[in-house]
Amino acid sequence: MKMSSRIGLFKLLILLFFQIYSVYAFTDGSDFTALQALKNEWDTLSKSWKSSDPCGTEWVGITCNNDNRVVSISLTNRNLKGKLPTEISTLSELQTLDLTGNPELSGPLPANIGNLRKLTFLSLMGCAFNGPIPDSIGNLEQLTRLSLNLNKFSGTIPASMGRLSKLYWFDIADNQLEGKLPVSDGASLPGLDMLLQTGHFHFGNNKLSGEIPEKLFSSEMTLLHVLFDGNQFTGSIPESLGLVQNLTVLRLDRNRLSGDIPSSLNNLTNLQELHLSDNKFTGSLPNLTSLTSLYTLDVSNNPLALSPVPSWIPFLNSLSTLRLEDIQLDGPVPTSLFSPLQLQTVSLKHNLINTTLDLGTNYSKQLDFVDLRDNFITGYKSPANNPVNVMLADNQVCQDPANQLSGYCNAVQPNSTFSTLTKCGNHCGKGKEPNQGCHCVYPLTGVFTLRSPSFSGFSNNSNFLKFGESLMTFFKNGKYPVDSVAMRNISENPTDYHLLINLLIFPSGRDRFNQTEMDSINSAFTIQDYKPPPRFGPYIFVADQYKTFSDLEDSKTVSMKVIIGVVVGVVVLLLLLALAGIYALRQKKRAQRATDQMNPFAKWDAGKNEMDAPQLMGTKAFTFEELSKCTNNFSDANDVGGGGYGQVYKGTLPNGQVIAIKRAQQGSMQGAFEFKTEIELLSRVHHKNVVKLLGFCFDQKEQMLVYEYIPNGSLRDGLSGKNGVKLDWTRRLKIALGSGKGLAYLHELADPPIIHRDVKSNNILLDEHLTAKVADFGLSKLVGDPEKAHVTTQVKGTMGYLDPEYYMTNQLTEKSDVYGFGVVMLELLTGKSPIDRGSYVVKEVKKKMDKSRNLYDLQELLDTTIIQNSGNLKGFEKYVDVALQCVEPEGVNRPTMSEVVQELESILRLVGLNPNADSATYEEASGDPYGRDSFEYTGVFPTPKP
């Protein structure tokens, strides 16, 4: 009786379960079909979208309402790959679609996306969607936030977007959009002037052109930010812009605007940021004393009329940053200019300012940087206990031998080494970082980009500390699972003055975030819930792919029976493996000695990663003892430098050969598989103009790469005079050609092809014959690798050499190497680093160049060594043309490296030299002893050649 009652109770519970399930389950049929289409297209969702009922079992990233209709899809930073299926248009109740940070989502947007008429939030930021923005997007009349930035959209802005009357956030920056800004015709055609509720026009870094329509702005608009920077707008600034009373940030810099700067801007009394640099404005700078809230004023690089330093600037009481570079200012600088209480940065370089510079006694206590290089200043009256970094190079005062060693004649603009990462003694594994308590965890990382900060320079770190405190206050108040935050590698894009902060967000309570937690953090940035401190301006945050989710969600669905079964099965399997292992070990010992003789990788110590010995091309495996002996136990005397990867040591083998050993530090150690892949790749690279890998060491928990030793150091050492090498014009041409051949080989003849990703003068070495050799593949990527289109938000490469497109796409390609090489070519001309004392060599050459004059009128920029030792600079103009083609802002307009090599070879012929006298063409110089067939990986050690 008791048994039957238990069975009856069990049946009752089953029945009750299905009754409850029937109430709270069964997703709407059409919605399920649409989600299934997404799942089929984005196969990475197959693990988290398992059940047959998305609403009933809460598929990750899916939210449903009480009617089992899908109302939200939030799949940020999920490594999604593929396209956006047209079936998504059937989700008629969808209100939120957030696919932020999936850089392998591509293809055009579905033309029927306008069917999602209840959509209020659409964010596709940081993907790779292309093609035109569909006209149907104008049907999304409930939309309040639209983020299409950091994609590859082309074509024009649809006029239909003027119907989005509820839109507040409108961000289409960092795309390839072109054409004019659409405005309404007063009848049936809508336009952007109808967006009266919009607070943000973020249109920067596109190809938009034509005049900015007078009709675009009106007093009824509620705009806070107008970011039109980095486009191709022409004509004058519309007077109507002065009617937008709420405006706080205005960026019109890096366009082709002309005419007078309108005095109507003085009506924008709430304006905090005004950027008008790099245009073609003429006339005088109008009096802007009504802009009492202004933090930043930048009118640099405009052909304004000759005039004195404006006397009204001291009345801008909130001013923090003042940039009036190259606008024909003359006369003295009044001491009152430095008196605004919040003033931190003043840059008036490349003007006609004269007499003695005097900061006075009432200068701002916040002042830390004054740049008046390239003027006609005859003296400097330095205040007592002066904390200000003053730069006066290229002025008359610095021509006096008595002043040439003074700080103000040699000062350099400070770079940031600021980091708030906790310094802990222990080393964390790959992907982990120490949190505030020195526990190794997996942080959420990404780049926090300030699009218009009202502070500049890195000498005052208080701004960044306030930022960190502000973030933690936000996370704590919102009860986010965040233990701490940290910053590192803060940098400023020299093109648009965007400030890039590499941000680390550490999980609380365990070593990683789960998917829900990561989504909530990303969402806080995407919908701008987080408000940074004053003066930080508009921002975006693009997170790196997070692939180490906590499995806590999945563990809840695993039954105890399954767990027990798995444990029992594993135990039995381990016993069988142990018995088999004992037998195999006995057999292995018998052949160990012979194997060691035949295969130097028999002692490959891969730890827990079992793998075949790497396939190598004439490369030797060294033991730790061998390399320790040849470097005197890695003594400081043998330490010749280092970087992010680790230290480099000079060593001498028993046969007398000198070698360079790259010894990885703990923080940059790779897994065994990754290290194997790298040495297999490097061993197959054989070219006269590429540094040769001689061997490697994977022993005693060490990872080392052994290269041929290059005695004359780097090209940067040569240009700076550090290695005592005199580089005349012909030597520089040969160095350019040699390094170009090396890169062309990597791009086009190496198999698989390689993108270097960090081309710079420090990574071009000079041997005893001054033959250039491309070095340092620590950041290289295989072009044929799955990561060919790898997009990362962690800043790669080196500032000054970075492809401008990288700041928009976070993607490095072969054309990124071409850009870096173009910067090196200009560096060969000037002898200076690409960013020297705050000046960017690319911008300086373009600004000073006059093709109608001898040597393009660039004599002032040339390294004096060229002029003193070279005589007639044949081929100079053609060389400059090639270099400037390489540094075109858009990769599609740059040549390939093989095309660059052909041009450089023709220049050497013009000079009267044989381009192949000292080195073969890049095809012939490969010196590959194995032939192209050996480049195909077979997974076995190659048979030695007789």
Curated annotation (Swiss-Prot):
Cellular location(s): Membrane
UniProt cross-references to CDD domains, sorted A to Z: STKc_IRAK
Membrane topology listed for this record: Single-pass type I membrane protein
Domain Protein kinase residues, every copy: 634-908
Region of interest (Disordered), ranges: 919-946
Highest taxon of the lineage: Eukaryota
Active site as annotated: D758
Signal peptide: 1-25
SMART domains xref list: S_TKc (SM00220)
Record-given protein name: Probable leucine-rich repeat receptor-like protein kinase At5g49770
Organism expressing this protein natively: Arabidopsis thaliana
